[in-house]
Amino acid sequence: MKLFITGIGTDVGKTIASSILVEALEADYWKPIQAGDLDNSDTNKVEKYVSNPTTKFHKNAYALQTPASPHYAAAIDGITIHLNQIKEPKTINHLVVEGAGGILVPLNTTDCVIDIIQPDYKVIVVSRHYLGSINHTLMTIEILKSRKLNVAGIIFSGDENKATESIILEKTNVLMLGRIDNEPYFDQNVIKYYADLFREKLLALSI
């Protein structure tokens, strides 16, 4: 099973969610494009959070120096991102693929993050409540569905907001996989706790 993790924007909790999914499934992890923070990349963070011995952490297709939209970060580095250079790693394990920002973040003048998503990927959307998050969540899911991509579930990150979550679930008819609370900190034990909570629903996606 291949899961693509996207968010409704930046800093909504994709990397924590990815860590939980990797731990729950003993999956491999791949972040095709990393923009900035190369000394403490998302791959480094997930590797720190995951404790199972099975997971492999695959190399970024592009590791860009500047924390910015990939198209701009690539331009600063003097390169252009090409989709044909983003090659999915081979593995016999489940694979968790983490996107960069939201689905319409540009990679170059023609392609966006959504264009990395393959037909056999199951997409999981991470949503976090803020003013405007309902609109951003509904638009994200609507665009994914318009591309005939498989939206397998939604994860809510942060404090619960029942009014926000209920209208999102009602309008999208997407499965809620779980919630990641605003924890004081995240470490391997906290990630494992959530992995145990999420595992059953995640495994059901592969059936």
Spell out what each predicted region is.
Residues E26-D28, D120-I124, K145-A152:
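Short, surface-exposed connector motifs at secondary-structure boundaries
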Residues N108-Y130:
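Inter-motif core of Ras-like GTPase G domains
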Residues S69-L107, I114:
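Phosphate-binding/switch loop-helix module in NTP-utilizing enzymes
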Residues K31-I33, I124-S127, A152-G158:
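Short internal beta-strands
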Residues L3-L21:
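Glycine-rich phosphate-binding P-loop
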Residues V22, I114-I117, N135-K145:
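Histidine-anchored nucleotide/phosphate-binding helix
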Residues I16-T80, N93:
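N-terminal phosphate/diphosphate-binding loop that engages ATP/GTP or pyrophosphate donors
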Residues I141-I207:
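C-terminal lobe/tail of nucleotide-utilizing enzymes
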